[in-house]
Regions:
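Membrane-water interface at transmembrane helix exits
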Residues: 35, 39, 43, 47, ...
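Transmembrane alpha-helical segments and their cytosolic interface motifs
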Residues: 98-144
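Juxtamembrane/interfacial segments around transmembrane helices
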Residues: 29, 70-82, 169-179
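N-terminal first transmembrane alpha-helix
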Residues: 1-63, 144
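Lipid-exposed faces of alpha-helical membrane segments in multi-pass integral membrane proteins
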Residues: 22, 26, 30, 34, ...
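Cytosolic/matrix-facing juxtamembrane and C-terminal tails of multi-pass cellular membrane proteins
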Residues: 154-184
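Charge-rich cytosolic interhelical loops and cytosolic tails of multi-pass membrane proteins
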Residues: 40-104
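Pore-lining and gate-forming transmembrane alpha-helices of multi-pass membrane transport proteins
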Residues: 23-24, 141-157, 161
Length: 184
């Protein structure tokens, strides 16, 4: 027979937990939920600060010329003239991504891009929630928290951009250096 000492359980309720600490899991859950509701185009806008912001929108107008691993002649012979329109560039690049998505370099770059993209948008959500809460509550060290969240957002944004740019270049490099398949 095992006896449960109820007095220990009652003492747990007396343990002083600050409301800020107790609400942290709720805030994290809300951030994850809100992040899941944000469409990927808006997340790209949060990271790149421009319209047509998905990584592939500048694949053939910018990135194709910015990486020495990319064989331009080979890529042109496989794909023909590069599209000028950002949406057309993204469509063509996305088809190449699907072709090479099993490559470990592409897979890892894609995973890191998505990780940093979501972390960036969640940080911005936390920043906005914190900003809104300052109108209702007096928050100790609010300026420090603002600066910390802003710094975190900027670092994550730069990391997201770097991962996205690397993903685009990796796909273009793989396509330009892979042997042409008959029927391609």
């Amino acid at each position: 027979n095992i006896k449960l000492d109820v007095s220990l359980l009652q003492n747990l309720y007396l343990f002083p937990i600050k409301a800020e600490i107790a609400s942290a899991p709720i805030i994290i859950f809300l951030c994850i939920l809100i992040n899941a509701l944000i469409p990927s185009n808006l997340k790209a806008l949060i990271i790149f600060w421009r319209i047509d912001a998905l990584p592939g929108h500048r694949a053939f107008s910018h990135f194709v010329f910015s990486d020495p691993r990319i064989n331009l002649d080979s890529l042109r012979s496989k794909l023909g003239e590069f599209p000028d329109n950002p949406r057309s560039q993204n469509l063509l690049w996305y088809s190449l991504l699907k072709k090479h998505e099993s490559n470990i370099t592409v897979k890892e770059a894609h995973q890191y891009f998505l990780l940093f993209r979501d972390a960036t948008s969640m940080t911005l959500i936390i920043f906005l929630l914190f900003f809104a809460s300052t109108f209702f509550y007096e928050i100790h060290m609010a300026k420090f928290v603002f600066l910390m969240l802003l710094g975190e957002y900027l670092l994550l944004m730069i990391a997201s951009r770097n991962m996205a740019n690397g993903l685009v270049k990796n796909v273009l490099s793989l396509e330009s250096n892979s042997p042409a398949i008959k029927g391609d």
